[in-house]
Amino acid sequence: MEKNLKNIEFIAEIASSHNGSIKILRKLVEKLILSNVTSIKFQIFKLNKLAHPSYKFFNALKNISIPSQAYKAIINKVLKSKKKVILEPFDNESFEFCKKFKKKVSVKISSSDNDNIDLIKTSLKYFDKVFISISGYKISSVEKLFKKLNRSKRVIFTYGFQSFPTDYRNLRMGFLKELKQKNMRVCYADHTSRDNIFE
């Protein structure tokens, strides 16, 4: 058991916890660089490429948007610290931005694109690893996708229950175990409350 635990990597996803503040984003990154997390994950989007001004959540997205140039400096800082970086682009322009880092970073395919085979195959050409969300998938569907991707060991299937806070009683952990038995690499993600994680 101890040997298996040593192989577990922990990812800290910043998401929108910076509230659109570059200053807060920098502080979060500085704290995470000093922590024991393995990777730091960023969500990247270009506001005018992601949503139309008429979209009801446009202003909310505007309030949490960070310019790509700011991300560039911060990502380079993380890479210099030897922490791993995972980027999740939400539009084509952001994807092109992520490609500039090439194999230095990994990429997460957003749920809306997890059946976009061309995008996934392009990602495998440019990035170190490719994380693909499979929440809601059946084992047979994951197997078909894995086969289409030539059973690449650089593909990491990401499963999680995304309600907040996540109720661990609703999780299908046996699902992940079955995927591992089929020689697939897996990642678990949730929104567990820090207050009830050990209940």
Q: What does each model-identified segment do?
A:
Residues M1-E199:
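Catalytic cores and adjacent flexible loops of soluble metabolic enzymes
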